[in-house]
């Protein structure tokens, strides 16, 4: 847990050093911001991309299980590092996602034409949401976890015409 906290704080410091705004430039911090085409998108604690971060956690749990349990990489006690690996991956993504290259890519190929990157508090919250997804995958049966991921993708896809699957496809191709 301490390593995960340290990684998260390092990501926050890097994002601040990259001149990302600490909070929404509107001056408020909202629990939910639902308009993906506004300047407040990806600036608050949760938004329509929160399900994607929860799904990241579920996928990272599966990756940790595969590496540490199924393949036995790292020995008997390696599985305890699953959450640390997940936080490191999510923190790395949050830093990469806020580089000019990725911000410009999002603007050019996704539905987020006005995307300007995340506020630091949003990135911090995204790491928290990913950790929640990891915890869900740890505690719930596999089929329930998969069902929740599919539901999250379908709802976000239907409501805002965007989700993790579409973002990956549009960013890569």
Where are these regions (language model features)?
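Bulky hydrophobic segments
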Residues: 1-115, 119, 131-173
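Active-site metal-coordination segments of metallo-dependent hydrolases
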Residues: 121-123
């Amino acid at each position: 847990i301490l390593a995960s906290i340290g990684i998260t704080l390092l990501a926050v410091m890097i994002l601040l050093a990259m001149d990302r705004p600490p909070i929404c430039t509107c001056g408020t911090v909202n629990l939910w911001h639902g308009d993906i085409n506004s300047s407040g998108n990806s600036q608050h604690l949760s938004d329509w991309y929160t399900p994607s971060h929860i799904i990241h956690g579920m996928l990272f749990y599966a990756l940790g299980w595969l590496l540490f349990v199924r393949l036995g990489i790292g020995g008997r006690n390696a599985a305890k590092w699953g959450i640390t690996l997940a936080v490191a991956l999510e923190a790395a993504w949050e830093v990469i996602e806020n580089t000019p290259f990725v911000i410009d890519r999002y603007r050019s190929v996704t539905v987020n034409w006005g995307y300007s990157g995340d506020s630091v508090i949003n990135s911090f919250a995204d790491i928290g949401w990913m950790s929640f997804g990891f915890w869900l995958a740890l505690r719930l049966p596999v089929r329930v976890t998969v069902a929740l991921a599919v539901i999250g993708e379908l709802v976000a896809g239907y409501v805002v015409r965007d989700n993790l699957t579409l973002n990956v496809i549009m960013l890569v191709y």
